[in-house]
Amino acid sequence: MKSLCYHFIGIGGIGMSALAHILLDRGYSVSGSDLSEGKIVETLKNKGVKFFLGNQEEHVPEESVVVYGSGISKNNPEFLAALNKGNRLIHRAELLAELTKEQISIFVTGSHGKTTVSSLITVILQEAGKTPSFAIGGLNGEGINGSSGSEYFVAEADESDGSIRNYSPEFSVITNIDDEHLSNFGGDRERLLASLQDFSTKTRQICWYNGDCSRLRSCLVGHTFGFTSSCDLHILTYRQEGWRSFFTVRYQNVLYEDVEVRLVGEHNVMNAAAAMGVALSLGIDEDTIRDALQRFPGVQRRLQRKNSSEVFLFLEDYAHHPSEIACTLQAVRSAVGSRRVLAICQPHRFSRLKECMGCFPSAFKGADEVLLTDVYSAGEAEEDVSYKELAQSISRESLVTCAYVPFSELQGFLEKHIRVHDVCVALGAGDIEVLGESLRDFEPKKLSLGLICGGRSCEHDISILSAQNIAKYLSHSFYEVQYFLITREGLWKTGSSLELSEETGKTIFDPEIAGKLSKVDVILPILHGPYGEDGAMQGFLETIGKPYTGPSLVFAAIGMNKVLTKRFMSDLGIPVVPYLPLTLKGWKQDQEKCLAQIKAAFSFPMFVKSVHLGSSIGVFEVHDTNELRDAINEAFVRDDDVFIEESRLGCREIEVSFLGDGSGVFFVAGMHERRGRGGFIDYQEKYGLSGRASAQIVFDVDLSKETREQLLGVAEKIYRLLQGKGSCRIDFFVDNEGSFWLSEINPIPGMTTASPFLAAFVRKGWNREQIVHQLVIDGLQRFDQRQRLISTPLIDQALAAR
């Protein structure tokens, strides 16, 4: 142990503790004090630090070097004791500068992203076989933020207090500049910018800076990174897949494609690009950089998962400035899709809240609901804050539901409010981290899910087969299931399984049925045809105020009306099979006139189809006038509206399945082909009924690349134009030349064991439980959005709790 001793005033701070680790690694004796003792202090104590709780002059060892930071008052008892004793006093930034003298220093500064960029650079160097020293403003996976190594030293340089004037690094990164900590610069942005400019000129080799930032670009010299085409390291593309991002960059005429990093959000792609630029400047090879970024373990309190439950997600993030909050929530939204995002925000410092009040309320657009709690003062004097007015501003400007809940009541409120599938994000640089710890093992109550099947349509039996298959994939960890069977006569039965009695059903108004229906949280309608798939059931569920899965009222009504679908799509330039609508009134008035019009429009064979039934119900292939007449009469027995369609016999039947919100996040399964024994695939062959083999489903569809892309593009266009919701299957006819026509839309596709809908998504990498979850998530989101417009349940609950 070296004889020299260092004493830290405020050793539990993230910046101070990093330097304490380095000094301990180098053999120095270290002591320190702080106003509280947390995990950081506990780690240092286990490493040999002598810790004192509170600030008292007797804590300062004789002849020690006393380290202080910008937040330490000159009236601090230990600071005064060091002055009186003649101890050497050194600012944290000066000590950091001294510690880096014998190594190649890489300093990262800027308003946002310092910790992530410095952590990424450190991990890349470690992957390259180096053992860098590092002093970082966040804990790694091992709970360490500082370490002494050799050759390289990676550190954060705090731009907030002007202390970066102490550094002259070999390499540097300036991530960005924001109106943050301006009070330390007399409110003058130019003084902050001048300090960064001075820092860049003192960089001895290369200063990497954000080339997308016009303020930096106007006054700095160095290498740029960013999405702007003039950047030296130009980010050409990026995409996010779940909790990973992929980006392509060009640097010095070399293209680096699909670089993967275990981070989310455009801001983190920028951070990864900055780290990659530094690594390339150091001569580190591409494979090493890729491997390091792909395996990057992350930093604690940077979208760190805190809970153990599998039915909801609780994340913690250090974001406390409005721009950080906005980036974090948008990244989470991209990762979790339609799941409800509940942001819990603890504003950091009264002064920062006041400085950022102009942009703070609009920072939460990526969330669905926001819980605002008490400001973390960070040592500042308490100020009056109208949390009610601030919550109203957030609701208005971010278009979310927002409520204030006192910090002491947060845990209890969340335990009542968190719902299966929720994603909670605790935001702040204060002590909001205790929330994640307290909810680590919390489990929300299961969702009560009501599965409705059967129905009055002629597809009653297929509905039950679909329900029986789907029921196998309703996870008992997520749902308590109540089954509702609608008889062919429109009566209802209910039970805890699909093995329902043969007794006559009851009306929907029966106390047992109505009572059970009122208690479920969300409805899963597995219904085909009229009264279930055509908007009737959807309208009923909206009227009684129940969330439901699958298509919305409007999408179901349009999708199940084949003529209306054809009219809309034809008007929008999408090819449809030529058709002629026929009304019951017109047919009854003058059959001969109708037949003449039909034969003038089409030649035999042709098809007679019911407007509101499934893809193979009420469909008749006809070859002469007598068959045509009989088929029309039969079709009108099944439906009030009929249409005649030109034959597409000989064409292939190609289908594309969808999940999600056509105006937001949705998923497309790869196309598949349905092949029959020859000719039209009727209802019996489609589902393998009456002892017949079901139609063959082919997933590796043999179509030209051009036709595939065009057909998928049109299918997606249809789903978007109709603002598809929940689920659907869109069917096409494709001829040998690659021409195709829209056939129809199925809002609730068959989900039997023989149906391709579930299998199509399984081939895409989903499992069947995930498909059910997605249906539920979309249904809940759609309901929540409508509820926000007519009520504010979160605010009401918060007020009631007070």
UniProtKB/Swiss-Prot annotation:
Which positions in this protein are listed as binding Mg(2+) 2? 744, 746
**What function does the entry list?**
Cell wall formation.
Q: Which family does it belong to?
A: In the N-terminal section; belongs to the MurCDEF family.
| The protein's name in its UniProt record | Bifunctional enzyme MurC/Ddl
BP-aspect Gene Ontology terms? cell division; cell wall organization; peptidoglycan biosynthetic process; regulation of cell shape
Asked if the record carries the keyword Aminoacyl-tRNA synthetase, the reply is no
Binding-site residues for Mg(2+) 1, renumbered to this chain = 731, 744
Q: What EC number(s) does this enzyme carry?
A: 6.3.2.8, 6.3.2.4
The family database entries (InterPro entries) matched by this protein are listed as: ATP-grasp, ATP_grasp_subdomain_1, D-Ala_lig_Van_CS, D_ala_D_ala, Dala_Dala_lig_C, Dala_Dala_lig_N, Mur-like_cat_sf, Mur_ligase_C
Species of provenance: Chlamydia muridarum (strain MoPn / Nigg)
